[in-house]
């Protein structure tokens, strides 16, 4: 079993506020290219944390790829209450994260910021590698997770960058 943790920018961090935004198609094209490569290299589990934006788009692509690959999907939410205050449209996306092969949460509810660090460490300790859409120059809260991955020297990290998206766009 080879697992791939998938996470990255949230939609609002990319200036994407509608599902039909043209940027989404470019991002999904890059995701599909990369996920196929991971699958061809033996990845058979893709792990999500239930975030909107990059993770949701990757989930959509992964569900499509399940038709052609022996792929299993999991969502590990940080909290049982994750997404409970989302809009109705986003509740549908949350439901998609729950309609996978394996679903668990780490904590019943948020109590302290330390839970995020514990959750991130759990993800690193229990997955084989990460696929991350993040650039340190465009800093968000992902910086904490990114820095933990970098500190874990034996944990492979594959990044999708804005340069990669420009390449996909020019193809």
UniProtKB/Swiss-Prot annotation:
It comes from the Bacteria. It holds the Pfam family YpsA. InterPro entries: YspA. Belongs to the UPF0398 family. This is UPF0398 protein stu0232. It comes from Streptococcus thermophilus (strain ATCC BAA-250 / LMG 18311).
């Amino acid at each position: 079993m080879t697992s791939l943790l998938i996470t990255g920018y949230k939609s609002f961090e990319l200036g994407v506020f509608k599902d039909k935004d043209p940027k989404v198609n470019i991002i999904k094209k890059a995701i599909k290219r990369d996920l196929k490569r991971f699958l061809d290299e033996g990845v058979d589990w893709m792990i999500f944390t239930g975030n909107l934006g990059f993770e949701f788009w990757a989930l959509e692509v992964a569900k499509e790829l399940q038709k052609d690959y022996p792929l299993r999907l999991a969502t590990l939410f940080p909290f049982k209450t994750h997404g409970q205050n989302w809009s109705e449209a986003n509740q549908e996306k949350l439901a998609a994260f729950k309609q996978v092969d394996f679903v668990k949460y780490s904590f019943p509810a948020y109590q302290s910021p330390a839970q995020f660090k514990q959750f991130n460490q759990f993800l690193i300790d229990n997955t084989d590698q990460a696929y991350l859409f993040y650039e340190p120059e465009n800093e968000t809260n992902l910086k904490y997770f990114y820095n933990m991955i970098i500190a874990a020297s034996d944990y492979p990290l594959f990044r999708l960058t804005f340069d990669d998206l420009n390449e996909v766009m020019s193809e």
